[in-house]
């Protein structure tokens, strides 16, 4: 935000007149070696970097509404290799951090705990994993392929409660670290009172409830807000960063064809009698 002659909170001073212009900046530092390695990977793919954008910020662009960014919110992007944090207030990014635990760590815990291949562990995580156990978990059985053996012949059955017992501790550790990072950030309480969860790992059952329990804050599960032309298959929380990068390119690098969906992507069709009204109800509710 800019400060012009003592007037604070100015987002864009272009066209304004004054004697003294100040600006408050948020700087993000990254490991030099890791950044150079990413540039090298892009170069080998014959791609050029237009601008670096921190992933949690991009996810915030995709998932947060303007009122949230104005009033104060912290976004938690639960990615594969890490969990990104981004706090917005007054419409601007004011704090970022990264917790070095992500969805891949949960997958590895399942693979080690159940002695199963990584692919099978990922499959079980997506279909059966839960952060909070249920009353039927001890009775519900899951087939677990064994490492290094034929999948159909070696599968053994375990109760779903065992899988929950493996997954929950890692998620608890993640949110406890998130809580510690937020508490030590020095950011105003109002900006961290509301939490928005997104990212692939946020899709695990019960994650929102566990986050609210540990962080003791209001939690909303989010997916990218509709972008015109974006397919439904790539509009989930796991694609939040990609959607945010598209919006960033549209705003900063002149891509007018990329814009938010301003109307219902599936507008109701004219009803034709009773059957038409039934079809309209099904489209609206399912």
Q: For the regions a protein language model found, what residue spans apply to each?
A:
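Conserved phosphate-binding/catalytic loops in two-lobed NTP-binding clefts
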Residues: 214-242
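Residue-level signature of catalytic and energy-coupling elements of molecular machines
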Residues: 42, 77, 110, 178, ...
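Feature representing long, continuous alpha-helical segments
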Residues: 108, 161, 165, 169-176, ...
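Glycine-rich phosphate-binding loops at beta-strand->alpha-helix junctions
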Residues: 30, 129-133, 190-214
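Glycine-rich phosphate-binding loop of actin/hexokinase-like ATP-binding domains
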Residues: 25, 71-113
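Phosphate/pyrophosphate-binding loops at sites that engage ATP/ADP/AMP, CoA/4′-phosphopantetheine
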Residues: 175, 179-193
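Active-site proximal loops enriched in glycine and acidic residues that flank catalytic Cys/His/Asp
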Residues: 78, 87-89, 97-98, 146, ...
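Nucleotide/phosphate-binding catalytic cleft detector across ATP-hydrolyzing
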Residues: 1-74, 92-93, 116-164, 185-188, ...
